[in-house]
């Protein structure tokens, strides 16, 4: 199934990377330096807590429909009251997964003043601008697939 380009809307998505230590930040949102090692490596102060970190948001063009409501119908194993929107896109076009973030109308905000940070995921170091989770409009609940197209079922994030 092809989706019409004229029906597509530009949205942004970010992949969940990992739970990482939370850094101490100053009044401007920049990380506070704890110390610098002899070889010049900067070590930032940590709060002792962990929080989820997401990849730098990427744009996507998808069919977007707000839905949900009070009906008792169930689709994809969810009541329509459990989700607020659905994305539809061609098979293999995007690789959205559960817990990804999606921005439809809100401005993307970044942790640490937009400074790029490094996150280690499965032994690989990934650089990200670390978007703020609550700046996103939705989180992906499910991604049912079919032969020619894929869907992403979205739940609104409380702001």
What are these regions (language model features)?
Residues 1-20, 159:
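Short, intrinsically disordered N-terminal pre-domain segments
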Residues 3, 25, 30-31, 36-159:
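Short, conserved turn/kink motifs that form compact alpha/beta structural patches or helix kinks used as
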